[in-house]
Amino acid sequence: MSPQYSGTSSQALPPGYCFNEYQIEEVIGEGGFGIVYRAYDRELDRQVAIKEYIPASMVSRADDMRLVLRSERFTRIFQAGLISFIQEAKTLARFSHPGLVHVLRFWQANDTAYMVMQLYSGETLKNLYSRQPEVVTETWIRKMLPPLFSALKTLHDQGYLHRDIAPDNLQIQANGEPVLLDFGSACKEIGHLTDKTEIMLKPGYAP
């Protein structure tokens, strides 16, 4: 994950909040189903990214930092998304490929779950194209595709499909190398359960 973010979140953990060796520094990304933080690993003296499962429309943050359901009717959907989030962390942690986001560990706390990932430089393809559309030429894309195909082959060889290959889920590092970010499994699982799959699966990017 990368440090490109300019917004704020009232639901986010505060700077300085700690999980064992990890200390939250700031929010660097946010979507409808998760918040990504830049954090400092005090044991290994490095920065990492931590993603928190937090479907904002279903939960609120209590004073003790736990997530609280806004309504009991969200229980089944929230738990299904949580299970998918944890399974995705386990799956991604199996791979060590420069084109796939590197998950270092995960855990459950605050009635939700977290995954620790490598912190990547650069920005998403979506942001890059919005900021410098002239950079994303056919020649540039052709150069970017081989390492992306290699990452996909690694997944396919192990029987996995990445169904969220979209510009906002593809990190372009400072050296130009692409990194496929998370599968968005929790988002998809919740989409299935709420009959909004056509929205959650990003038409044009997911089968």
Model regions: which residues?
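Activation-segment/catalytic-loop signature of the eukaryotic protein kinase fold
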Residues: 106
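Conserved short submotifs of the Hanks-type protein kinase catalytic core
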Residues: 110-124
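Conserved activation segment of eukaryotic-like protein kinases, specifically the C-terminal portion
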Residues: 196-206
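AlphaC helix of the eukaryotic protein kinase fold
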Residues: 63-94
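Protein kinase catalytic-loop region centered on the HRD/HxD motif
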Residues: 150-160
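Activation segment signature within eukaryotic-like protein kinase domains
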Residues: 144-145
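AlphaC helix of the protein kinase catalytic domain
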Residues: 125-136
